[in-house]
């Protein structure tokens, strides 16, 4: 009820439950990675099923990935962008499990509506560095600074975040919704 409209059909209930589980696991993994050095690793239970069933595993009996496993893969990427909504602000963390620092990266953040149109300002941070084995906030802004003026657009748009190396190759990317899913 808090994050999604409660489905009426069983099949929809299973689907929404698996999507919500994936989001919850990703949220937890990102929080653990963000809180380094106090948390230096995370395992989740359980990887796979030993018979066909709807369960909390990340991989089903037939070897198919569930939403949880896709979200865990994203959250465990060696370099990960983690935007965090904190009250009326957004803080963008860069998380790195690499053993080498990364220099001269560019972080682009643009607000887009659900039709693909740019609706807010595009923010570009150049010469971003990500030290080895770190978690750090590289950008912080008030929500109203990111969204266009006028009507309540937080429900009608999202932010795309892309981290690129000096050759223009994408190192990491993610999206941030300004409002709850439902």
Task: Provide a role label for each language-model segment.
Residues 1-103:
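Substrate-binding clefts and catalytic carboxylate motifs of secreted carbohydrate-active enzymes
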Residues 43-48, 94-96, 109-113, 123, ...:
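Active-site proximal loops enriched in glycine and acidic residues that flank catalytic Cys/His/Asp
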Residues 90-96, 138-140, 159-163:
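Buried hydrophobic-core signal for structured, non-transmembrane domains
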Residues 99, 116-117, 168:
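Residue-level signal for glycine
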Residues 105, 121-122, 170-174:
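Extracellular and select intracellular beta-sandwich modules with Ser/Thr-enriched
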């Amino acid at each position: 009820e808090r994050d999604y409209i409660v489905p009426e059909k069983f099949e929809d209930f299973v689907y929404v439950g698996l999507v919500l589980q994936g989001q919850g696991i990703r949220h937890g993994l990102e929080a653990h990675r963000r809180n380094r050095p106090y948390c230096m690793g995370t395992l989740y239970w359980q990887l796979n099923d030993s018979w066909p069933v709807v369960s909390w595993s990340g991989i089903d009996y037939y070897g198919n990935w569930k939403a949880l496993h896709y979200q865990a893969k994203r959250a465990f990427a060696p370099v990960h962008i983690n935007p965090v909504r904190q009250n009326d602000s957004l803080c963008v963390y860069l998380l790195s499990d690499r053993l080498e620092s990364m220099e001269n990266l560019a972080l682009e953040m643009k607000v887009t509506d659900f039709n693909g149109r740019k609706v807010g300002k595009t923010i570009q941070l150049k010469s971003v560095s990500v030290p080895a084995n770190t978690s750090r906030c590289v950008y912080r802004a008030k929500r109203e600074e990111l969204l266009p003026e006028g009507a309540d657009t937080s429900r009608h748009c999202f932010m795309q975040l892309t981290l690129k190396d000096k050759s223009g190759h994408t190192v990491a990317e993610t999206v941030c919704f300004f409002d709850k899913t439902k």
